[in-house]
A protein has these predicted regions:
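N-terminal small/glycine-rich loop or linker at the start of catalytic domains
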Residues: 40-59, 110-111
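Active-site environment of divalent metal-dependent phosphoester hydrolases
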Residues: 24-28, 50-52, 90-94, 129-135, ...
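Histidine/acidic residue-rich metal-binding segments in metalloenzymes
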Residues: 67-166, 188-209, 253-257
Length: 259
């Protein structure tokens, strides 16, 4: 019933394509089977893949060595996964400026994981935060970077150079700004870094796509994606509204092609 409720929320919001980020319970596979009833094309990696002891348990399964990673990639294929989702870093620490939880994967590991997924015929969605981690992911050839907080000009130019699709999920922070859950000053600082990152990415012609990270605290299914589009419009200004609409349409087209 809950999955149907979420699908109905997407339908009500006029959304016809949903790409989830994995889960350990099989919910995405069930949602994909039900989605056509709601006029929705649904894509799932079945489960996300993370290194044991690092962030990612909430959305998937862990590997301890290379053999285990390759086994998980094969399991995604056998389960009918539409793509591979890898977790290369932790998440934002909303109480500390500029801090990402969990040690990032090494550059060599990200390259190898991405290549193995592509060799299996599957595109790669990468959960990434931090400028160096974004550069590693883009240069490794991941197909999309999710979140991508705390970037700099070098990492943004790197995404542009490699035609990496960036899904910034700004709404995960903007929806927290006034609810008192985390320190207001820190949230405002994080949001400011997101604004600057989006503005620079827009200037550098990074391929942008709207995504909400729905299910995160304060981000509702269906409504979240419209809030993401709205906050992007506010950040870039009314004068860039039409161009942003074109860019997001192009980004969605590329997402649909790759995933």
């Amino acid at each position: 019933d809950l999955i149907r409720e979420h699908l109905a929320a997407y339908q009500k919001a006029g959304i016809s394509y949903v790409r989830d980020g994995g889960d350990p319970y099989g919910a995405g596979v069930l949602a994909r089977s039900l989605a056509p009833e709601y006029g929705i094309t649904y894509r799932t990696p079945v489960f996300a893949i993370h290194r044991a002891g690092r962030y990612g348990k909430i959305v998937g399964r862990a590997f301890s060595d290379w053999k285990e990673y390759c086994t998980l990639v094969r399991e995604v294929r056998r389960a009918g996964g539409d793509f591979i989702k890898i977790m290369t870093t932790g998440i934002l620490d909303f109480a500390t400026k500029g801090h990402v939880t969990s040690e990032p994967l090494s550059r060599e590991e990200v390259f190898a994981m991405t290549a193995a997924a592509h060799d299996a015929g599957l595109s790669v969605m990468a959960h990434v935060n931090g400028a160096q981690a974004v550069m590693d992911a883009a240069e490794a050839g991941v197909d999309s970077v999710e979140h991508g907080n705390f970037q700099n000009e070098e990492s943004i130019c790197c995404m542009a150079e490699h035609a990496t699709i960036w899904v910034p999920t700004i709404v995960t922070v903007s929806n927290l700004l006034e609810n008192g859950r985390y320190p207001a000053e820190t949230l405002a600082w994080i949001f400011e870094t997101q604004k600057k990152g989006l503005q620079l990415a827009f200037e550098k012609d990074v391929v942008l796509a709207a995504g909400s990270d729905a299910g995160a605290y304060g981000v509702l299914h269906g409504k979240g994606i419209r809030e993401e589009e709205s906050v992007m419009r506010k950040i870039l200004g009314a004068e860039n509204g039409q161009e942003l609409e074109k860019r997001l349409a192009f980004g969605e087209k590329k997402i649909r092609e790759k995933f």
